[in-house]
Amino acid sequence: MLTAKELNIADEYFKVLKIVRRRTARPVVAAFIGLAGSGKSTVARRLAREIGGVLISGDAIRVLLRKNNLPYKNVRAISENIARRAIASGANVVFDSDAADLVKRKRLDALARQAQARVLYIRLVAEPDVTFGRMIAGAPDPFFAGASTPWRAAPRERGVVVKLRELWRRTPHHYQWNSKQGGRWELKKLPVKFSATIDTTDTKTWQRQISQLAKRFRRA
């Protein structure tokens, strides 16, 4: 159960959402599985626009919690509270947080059942050099830029370091190590029925694939 302060965070987030009417016959709860730097937030925004949905960002909620000196332990519950209201208002919901964890997927499945919605999982991958390049060249979002790290530098550089640390920490959830021929990471098989696996290395390619996927969702 959320505390009064956490409910205020959910209210604050929901108030700034631009609710749009869903473009699918049945409500959709869409979630992504992919490492930091794979493009989850960018692709999620594109998908939300194409299916008539709202984007719910776990990192944005964490920033609100941090500003109010609140712990992160109920981020999922806050996200779900916002999602239920968005679906009830006629929108689809797209989450940009990594859903590789079984517990998180079970919660998403339960949310979809309660809302009589379809839950859809999309896997994102990218060439490692492109992933690292995005992190180094881009501006980290406020959550990473404000996160704690012993690395002393300007906020932007600190944010990049934290995001790289997060990629390193989460890699075993997505890849397994093959020691043959000097060693390489191989994509791990997960017990998930994916609607699609999309390589975001090339922008035009993933944008085309997301548009095709959205068209499928709208027809279903």
Short names for language-model regions:
Residues 115-135:
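Conserved phosphate-donor/acceptor-positioning beta-strand/loop module used by diverse small-molecule
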Residues 36:
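The conserved Walker
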Residues 39:
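Conserved glycine(s) of the Walker
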Residues 96-108:
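Acidic, metal-coordinating catalytic cores used for nucleic-acid/nucleotide bond scission
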Residues 42-91:
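Conserved substrate/cofactor phosphate-moiety recognition/catalytic segment
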Residues 32:
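Hydrophobic anchor at the beta1->P-loop junction of P-loop NTPases
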Residues 141-220:
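Small-molecule kinase domains that catalyze NTP-dependent phosphoryl transfer to phosphate-bearing small molecules
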Residues 1-21:
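N-terminal pre-Walker A segment at the start of P-loop NTPase domains
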